[in-house]
């Protein structure tokens, strides 16, 4: 069985400008990458990716590579990606979960939170594989922190997922905590296998970013935002499959930005001399 989240049923109260800016930055950098030759891309990954051995000081880049100071690559790596599926998956998860977290943190706090989670993810990877010379790239670790924040603040939000069971495809609603905890368990079970492989998926970076998100969310959330809020109404998660056309309609409604309704101000004139003699005049 396999399932992939597509969008949530959790509208926001503001434009997610930081989320969009982060997505735009990653996409722009990726298109710059694909315009390069393969050797140029690899050089870029070593210059701006987080290379554990270089960060720990046990190795150094060749003189021909002029990258950032090693400490800065703990953050710069989040804007690099290794392929179309890599960036598509990361941007999908940031699109789904980032806007709500930004809404509950605010613009400045959200971007600081995102970058700290990214740095925590790369540090986790460096500490687990200090002698690795493979560059760490991708926004997965930072987005894992965003997913942790979503789990704490919106555990019961409905997430529309596409579920594949053998040859059958179903569109169902699942609670956010089921989707996110399932993802977390997958990272935990897969992490040990990455210890014996140079390169590949950096599962410990994902776990490090997620843990950072759990720790930082209570600090970065807006005042009054509850952690794991109690359900005010009975859950209405839809387990029964629905047709694809309904999913399309739900998606459009979820991200449609309705015009703000302006409430007209009622101007009340001061009572005139003639009105003052009227017994029904409220100003009398």
Where are these regions (language model features)?
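A detector for small-residue-rich transmembrane helices and their helix-helix packing motifs
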Residues: 1-271, 278-282
């Amino acid at each position: 069985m396999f399932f992939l989240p597509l969008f949530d049923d959790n509208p926001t109260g503001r434009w997610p400008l930081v989320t969009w800016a982060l997505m735009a930055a990653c996409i722009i950098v990726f298109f710059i990458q694909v315009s390069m030759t393969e050797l140029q891309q690899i050089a870029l990954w070593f210059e701006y990716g987080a290379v554990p051995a270089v960060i720990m000081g046990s190795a150094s880049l060749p003189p021909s590579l002029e990258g950032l100071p090693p400490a800065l690559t703990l953050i710069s790596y989040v804007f690099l990606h290794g392929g179309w599926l890599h960036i598509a998956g990361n941007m999908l998860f940031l699109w789904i979960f980032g806007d709500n977290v930004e809404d509950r943190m605010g613009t400045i706090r959200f971007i600081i939170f995102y970058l700290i989670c990214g740095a925590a993810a790369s540090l986790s990877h460096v500490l687990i594989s200090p002698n690795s010379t493979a560059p760490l790239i991708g926004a997965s670790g930072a987005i894992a922190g965003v997913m942790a924040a979503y789990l704490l603040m919106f555990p019961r939000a409905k997430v529309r997922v596409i579920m594949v069971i053998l040859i059958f495809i179903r569109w169902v609603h699942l609670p956010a905590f089921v989707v996110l905890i399932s993802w977390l368990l997958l990272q935990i079970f897969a992490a040990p296998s990455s210890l014996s492989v140079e390169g590949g998926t950096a599962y410990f970076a994902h776990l490090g970013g997620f843990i950072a998100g759990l720790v930082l969310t209570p600090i970065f959330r807006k005042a009054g935002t509850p952690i794991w809020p109690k359900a005010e109404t009975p859950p209405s998660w839809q387990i029964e499959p629905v047709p694809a056309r309904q999913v399309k309609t739900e998606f459009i409604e979820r991200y449609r930005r309705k015009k703000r309704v302006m409430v007209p101000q009622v101007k009340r004139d001061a009572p005139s001399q003639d009105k003052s003699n009227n017994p029904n005049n409220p100003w009398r």
